[in-house]
């Protein structure tokens, strides 16, 4: 039955909220979006909780996979023919765009979850026709099944594309596990339209041209910069500014930027030989019969030489299916002028180019076309610093190859996490500083050794709050987004972390000194990383004892101590906490509310809403507030692990009153006297209906023990977030 005959449709009860138009956030847009804490659970994962991807990947015949991928590169399909009979350029673009969404500020984006398969990325204008690349890979994905994730396959396909065209890559590591629905936590920008120029409503720029943090791309729907120029207006020097900002936010320096731009454009071509206005919608907006294909041209041929993707048209080099130094040869040999592609996009073409330097047509080798350069390519020629590097690479091809190989590996592996997560036979032996290396430990402590250390910590001058706060501060830097930070490595001892305001340097140094003395007195080989975590557990056990409960906080030894040489101090600046709701601290006043910042940190720490709730309640009664403040400490028995925070939060004997920015007073309803003070973070657990439901559970008389058990479980999760060896 046709669905286009609206008058013939039958009425049907339809009570499910099956699209995004009717949700509580439309009615109450200021509601906390707790859904970002509940993504990617096993209800959406078809593999089930017992599936171990690492074991599956390690059972692959890896050489066979690579051979199949290399064979695919030259197996052109009629439904989407390969340029010059080689899919290399398409596969490299797919891999680049999978990895290129990574931004260093919050570690989100990147290649490690296969998110290019889902909205919004699968429908970004800059990802045009990458749906075809993934469909070309489907026979290989189907063949190897659960052993090879889409996330790993897309990056490996990019590597094999380069190798099939004569370039030796630096290596490849597997270990990227697929997600199964769009990521709800990533902020891609406030714009409401694709490719919106700067200066309009919901603009991501302020001031002269200050890009909003944590964004890296210059426009909604682009991976990095606009190939036509800033806001579509060619000006290589202005584009160079955008490139420097964008690539820095992708964790790349100038040398890596030049290498990646040149290496990415040494092969393949851009597509703009047609009318973009006739293209069908992107995959998410396509008709059901299109089966997830977007940007279809149903009015003309629309494939091969007639493909339209970015609108820019042409190859960058003379031999687009061969790795060589031709990119720099053309860039510096010829003068270039601004032209328009058949699709109307601004691009640069050479003046008076020799015929032998012109690439041949993708379908007919008897025809030659002008090569082209984007505004980003011309930036390498016009920007003085970029030009120095580009000329050096032109004159030293081997240096260029090495720099590009390393930069490509970094681009495609940055968000995979530490080297301990790497899988497969092609993992490079060399340790790289951006991997945040941590040395392995060579000791194993017996239970008696651990008990002796715990007793020494318990008998030291350190308070419960000092022990717990220091362990928390060491572990809270962990980001589940790119798996950076955490307690392993004990980089809280090193610059810059030891001097971060949020770590209370004076208190931190006191605790570290005492712990180091204990380690020395006991002649213990234990790392400071392990000792800091062990000490936090001692503090919690003492607090539970003070509440009348005897517990043991699980402790998994095996953390190493990083050194300054192993640490790129500048790269850790982005991990510095400027807020921590768990310790009731804000470094400054922010436009974003304190409770939203708490949600942000909780999501990066991979906490559920329940875990976030129980941790807040426990941290408050342990007295771990920054600076020892009393905000939210709803107890007369600080240092005892009780459920007092939740009991008093939900007690109707009190009323709540604003008392300044992010400050509230809790007054006795009968007398009007102030009993406690609180922050917005504290109050949200009583005001938000979902969080209050959790708070009520922990306030119940029969859940005192459950509160302690759940707090310990959540605490151990935080301490072990970066223990990928467990």
From Swiss-Prot:
NCBIfam families from the UniProt entry: cat_per_HPI, PRK15061.1
| EC top class, as a word | oxidoreductase
Give coiled-coil spans as residue ranges: none
**GO CC terms on record?**
cytosol
The gene name reads katG
* Cofactor(s) essential for the protein: heme b
- How is this protein organized at the quaternary level? Homodimer or homotetramer.
Q: What's this protein's name?
A: Catalase-peroxidase
């Amino acid at each position: 039955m046709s669905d286009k005959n609206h008058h013939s449709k039958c009425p049907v009860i339809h009570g499910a909220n099956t699209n995004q138009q009717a949700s509580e956030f439309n009615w109450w847009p200021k509601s906390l979006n707790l859904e970002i804490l509940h993504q990617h659970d096993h209800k959406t994962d078809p593999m089930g909780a017992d599936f171990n991807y690492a074991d599956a990947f390690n059972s692959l015949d890896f050489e066979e996979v690579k051979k199949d991928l290399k064979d695919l590169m030259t197996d052109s399909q009629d439904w989407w023919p390969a340029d010059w009979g080689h899919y290399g350029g398409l596969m490299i673009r797919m891999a680049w765009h999978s990895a290129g969404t990574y931004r260093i500020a919050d570690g989100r984006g990147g290649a490690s979850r296969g998110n290019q398969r889902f909205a919004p990325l699968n429908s970004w204008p800059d990802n045009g026709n990458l749906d075809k690349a993934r469909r070309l890979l489907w026979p290989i994905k189907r063949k190897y099944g659960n052993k090879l994730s889409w996330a790993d396959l897309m990056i490996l396909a990019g590597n094999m594309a380069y190798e099939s065209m004569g370039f030796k890559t630096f290596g490849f590591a597997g270990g990227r596990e697929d997600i199964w629905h769009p990521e709800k936590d990533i902020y891609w920008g406030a714009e409401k339209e694709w490719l919106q120029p700067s200066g309009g409503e919901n603009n991501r720029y302020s001031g002269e041209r200050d890009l909003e943090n944590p964004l890296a791309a210059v426009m909604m729907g682009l991976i990095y910069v606009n190939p036509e120029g800033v806001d579509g207006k060619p000006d290589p020097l202005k584009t160079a500014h955008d490139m420097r900002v964008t690539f820095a936010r992708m964790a790349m320096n100038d040398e890596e930027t030049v290498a990646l731009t040149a290496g990415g454009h040494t092969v393949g071509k851009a597509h703009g030989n047609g009318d973009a206005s006739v293209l069908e919608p992107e995959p998410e907006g396509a008709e059901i019969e299109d089966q997830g294909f977007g940007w279809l041209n149903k009015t003309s041929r629309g494939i091969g030489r007639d493909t339209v993707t970015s609108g820019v048209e042409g190859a960058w080099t003379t031999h687009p299916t061969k790795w060589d130094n031709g990119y720099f040869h053309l860039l510096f040999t010829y003068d270039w002028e601004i032209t328009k592609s058949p699709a109307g996009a601004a691009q640069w073409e050479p003046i008076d180019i020799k015929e032998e330097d012109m690439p041949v047509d993708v379908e007919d080798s008897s025809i030659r076309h002008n090569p082209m350069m984007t505004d980003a390519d011309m930036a390498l020629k016009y920007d003085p610093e970029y030009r120095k590097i580009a000329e050096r690479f032109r004159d030293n091809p081997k240096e260029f190859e090495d720099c590009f190989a390393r930069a490509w590996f970094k681009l495609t592996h940055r968000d995979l996490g530490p080297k301990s997560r790497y899988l497969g036979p092609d993992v490079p032996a060399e340790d790289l500083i951006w991997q945040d290396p941590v040395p392995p430990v060579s000791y194993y402590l017996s239970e008696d050794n651990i008990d002796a250390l715990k007793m020494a910590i318990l008998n030291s001058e350190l308070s419960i709050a000092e022990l717990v706060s220091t362990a928390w501060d060491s572990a809270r830097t962990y980001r589940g987004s790119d798996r950076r930070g955490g307690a392993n490595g004990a980089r809280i001892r090193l610059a810059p972390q030891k001097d971060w305001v949020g770590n209370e340097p004076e208190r931190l140094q006191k605790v570290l000194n005492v712990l180091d003395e204990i380690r020395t007195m006991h002649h213990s080989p234990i790392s400071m990383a392990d000792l800091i975590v062990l000490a936090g557990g001692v503090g919690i056990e003492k607090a539970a004892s003070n509440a009348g409960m005897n517990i043991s906080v699980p402790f998994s030894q095996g953390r190493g101590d990083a050194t300054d040489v192993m640490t790129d101090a500048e790269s850790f600046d982005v991990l510095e906490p400027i807020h921590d709701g768990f310790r009731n601290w804000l470094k400054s006043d922010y436009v974003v509310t304190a409770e939203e910042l708490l949600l942000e940190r909780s999501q990066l720490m991979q906490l559920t809403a329940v875990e976030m709730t129980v941790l807040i309640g426990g941290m408050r009664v342990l007295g771990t507030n920054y600076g020892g403040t009393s905000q939210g400490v709803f107890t007369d028995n600080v240092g005892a692990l009780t459920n007092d925070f939740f009991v008093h939060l939900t007690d109707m004997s009190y009323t709540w009153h604003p008392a300044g920015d992010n400050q509230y007073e809790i007054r006795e309803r009968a007398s009007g006297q102030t009993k406690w003070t609180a922050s917005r973070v504290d109050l949200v657990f009583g005001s938000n209906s979902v969080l209050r439901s959790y708070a009520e559970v922990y306030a119940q008389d029969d859940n005192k023990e459950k509160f302690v058990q759940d707090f310990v479980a959540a605490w151990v999760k935080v301490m072990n977030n970066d223990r990928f060896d467990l």
